[in-house]
Regions:
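Substrate-binding rim/cap in mid-to-C-terminal beta-strand-loop elements of soluble/periplasmic
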Residues: 59, 132-149, 246, 271-275, ...
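Beta-strand elements within well-structured catalytic alpha/beta cores of enzymes
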Residues: 2-16, 33-34, 58, 98, ...
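C-terminal cap/loop subdomain of S1 sulfatases and analogous C-terminal strand-loop tails that border
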Residues: 119, 124-125, 130-133, 296-307, ...
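Histidine-centered active-site microenvironments of extracellular/periplasmic hydrolases
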Residues: 119-122, 127-129, 190-198, 275-332, ...
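A short aromatic-rich beta-strand->coil structural motif
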Residues: 5-11, 98, 110, 143, ...
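Formylglycine-dependent
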Residues: 70-100, 112-260, 409, 413-414
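Long, internal low-complexity/basic segments
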Residues: 1-3, 10, 14-15, 40, ...
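Active-site segment of extracytoplasmic enzymes that catalyze sulfate/phosphate-ester chemistry
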Residues: 7-10, 14-106, 117, 121, ...
Length: 464
């Protein structure tokens, strides 16, 4: 039988912002229970540390240089988009493939890949917000299968309630498998959404938390460089990102506590979803996946936010290492895996579980099938992941992290970076350009070139 699939994705959450990844301050009992009974991946990475590109990669199994989404989609430009436009319309997405094969498909949460008023990408049941970014968790305009209204309460609670309603309703069609995409719009991590004390039910737990799980660091000079670049754009009459808050947020204890409380709101919702699956008898034939669109620095390395929060873009672990928990049908539980996987690999792995990957595998798709890892077999797995963030491409292995920078700009000469993760796991001592490491640097650089030469689509390859 085809299993039901629940794919939960959060917005801006590093792996270490979950209790089961070793954080003893954050309250995530439901996620910890999911990890205890399922598989926890310790080295899961996103291909790009921005919302829209990473989501496009999970939905399509492709890298940004293949699907063409390289940064977040700007809500302010939405009126200029063609009717019914979405950024990955030409690709066979996970919900479209499952829909063709008899699945009921639902998307409840943040989309951020195109127009929002109508269902996209093979989705039958469509519930989302009327914007991609979260300015406030309360009072958001919601779209429920074409009906638009303001929801006064917390948006994460709203999406959780609608997910439970959807699961309850599936008992009317028990023989039809379903795919539920549940991309929450939290914890988010930007002002004004996390400015000041939180209004949610978990704030009291964190109001006086010392937040020792977050390092206290001075501002990274590259975060300041990014701010200065944004100011140059503004002086030229261009609209650049608002980096003022990104320089104010590091070490802001109130916002850090607010952020943690939003993670707990999500955890509460995950508990509701798991209870709904069990109460309706779906738990024996359902796969549940919990992950994030990308990681997020909460002041680590002296910057706040994504890979693009510095100039040039960085590829530090904190911005790319994501939680990945899998539980359910066909998965050997109570284990953790240290194998290196990418969120693009979810695509191939789920399709293989359904017997639908063989034909797609012949296409030029970098998504890797990690089914073996779900039953504890890692004998034939290659421990490396590839990352791209516009002017930065990177490879991570258990021993090394290498950032390769675009070399075609005379205005901004960019430096490569090499880190020895065995002796320098926090990526502090850049070894690039040193004679004793030149062979390793050349080896990793060649691997990056081979990977992107293999998979990049010339239409969408920013480096060529």
């Amino acid at each position: 039988d085809f299993p039901n699939i629940v794919l939960i994705m959060t917005d801006n959450q590093p792996a270490e912002a979950v209790g089961c990844y070793g954080n003893n301050e954050i309250y995530t009992p439901n996620l910890d229970a999911l990890a205890a009974d399922g598989v926890r991946f310790n080295n899961a990475y996103c291909p790009n540390a921005m919302c829209s590109p990473s989501r496009a990669s999970v939905w399509s199994g492709r890298m940004p240089c293949q699907h063409g989404v390289h940064t977040w989609l700007n809500d302010k430009l939405m009126d200029q988009w063609p009717e019914d436009w979405n950024a990955i319309a030409e690709f066979d997405t996970l919900p479209e493939i499952l829909n063709r094969n008899g699945y009921a498909t639902a998307m409840i949460g943040k989309y951020h890949l195109g127009k929002l008023d109508k269902p996209q990408n093979g989705i039958d049941h469509w519930i989302t917000m009327s914007r991609g970014h979260t300015l406030d968790f309360y009072g958001n305009e919601m779209i429920v299968n074409g009906d638009t209204f303001i929801h006064d309460g917390h948006s994460v609670d709203f999406f959780s309630e609608k997910a439970v309603d959807y699961i309850d309703g599936r008992t009317n069609s028990p023989d039809q498998p379903f795919l539920l995409m549940l991309p929450y719009n939290g914890p988010y991590g930007h002002w004004p959404a996390i400015l000041g004390p939180a209004k949610n039910q978990f704030w009291d737990r964190y109001a006086d938390m010392p937040m020792t799980s977050i390092p206290r660091e001075g501002l990274n000079e590259r975060a300041i460089d990014a701010f200065q670049l944004a100011m140059e754009w503004l002086h030229q009459g261009k609209e650049g990102p608002n980096f003022y808050s990104l320089l104010q947020l590091p070490n802001n204890l109130t916002s850090l506590r607010n952020y943690y409380s939003q993670v707990s709101v999500i955890d509460h919702g995950v508990g509701q979803v798991m209870n709904a699956l069990k109460e309706n008898g779906f738990d024996d034939n359902t796969i549940v996946i919990y992950t994030a669109d990308h990681g997020f620095s909460l002041g680590h390395h002296g910057f706040w936010g994504h890979g693009q929060a510095t100039w040039p873009s960085n590829a530090y672990r904190i911005a790319y290492n994501i939680p990945l928990l899998m539980w359910g049908a066909g998965i050997s539980g109570k284990q953790s895996s240290s194998s290196f996987v990418s969120s693009t690999d979810i695509y191939a792995t789920l399709l293989d579980r359904l017997g639908l990957w063989e034909d797609l595998e012949k296409q030029n798709i970098p998504s890797r099938n990690f089914t073996g890892l779900l039953i504890g077999d890692d004998d034939n797995w290659t421990d490396e992941v590839f990352i791209e963030q516009e002017e930065t491409r990177a490879i991570r292995t258990p021993a090394w992290s290498y950032f390769k920078r675009f070399g075609g700009s005379e205005t901004y000469p960019l430096k490569n970076e090499l880190y020895d993760l065995i002796n320098d796991p926090d990526e502090r001592a850049d070894l690039s350009g040193q004679k004793e490491h030149q062979d390793k640097e050349r080896e990793l650089s060649d691997k990056i070139d081979i990977f992107f030469n293999t998979y990049a689509n010339p239409k969408f390859d920013l480096w060529n």
